[in-house]
Amino acid sequence: MSHHKIELRSVSYTYPDGSRALSDISFTVSHGQSVGILGANGAGKSTLLLLLMGVLRPCSGEILIGDVKMTPATLPDIRKRLGLVFQNPDDQLFMNSIYEDVAFGPRNAKLSGQEVDRRVTEALQTVGIPHLKDRPPYRCSGGEKRAAAIAGILAMQPDVLILDEPTSDLDPKARRRT
């Protein structure tokens, strides 16, 4: 079994106000697969992603990342293997420059300055915005912010990449690159 597998087994989630977001969801995503989840607004897509990241805990069922069941004890190690790009890039970008935002995670992981620079440069090139490295996020378009948020996660080199509305705000060329 691949250590990159994601598995949900009979997962349900109800918000504290009683609104049921997910009911008895089961699926497996294997290493190398790309999966898109489609649904109407309010259908539970973002809730599902928050459950996968351990931000929310299922009311019933279980989530496994690789062969490890997600529990409060395993969550810190699981989170190191997952990268989440939020639906709204403004929730993710908070530093004074795009470079600083993309470098934030690798620096907090205590990587060397040389490794941080290498990862930031590579991530910015991957999403096509190396020319924006010195620009403050508030001076970027929605698509540029989206690309910067994706670069910030790519710089962490997660085993699993989870994207909430990954192509919103991106132009057609940037969508193909993403």
Protein language model regions, located:
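The feature captures the beta-strand-to-loop junction immediately N-terminal to the Walker
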Residues: 38-40
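Conserved catalytic motifs of ABC-family nucleotide-binding domains
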Residues: 157
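Catalytic Walker B motif of ABC-type/P-loop ATPase nucleotide-binding domains
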Residues: 161-164
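Conserved ABC ATPase "signature" region
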Residues: 114-132
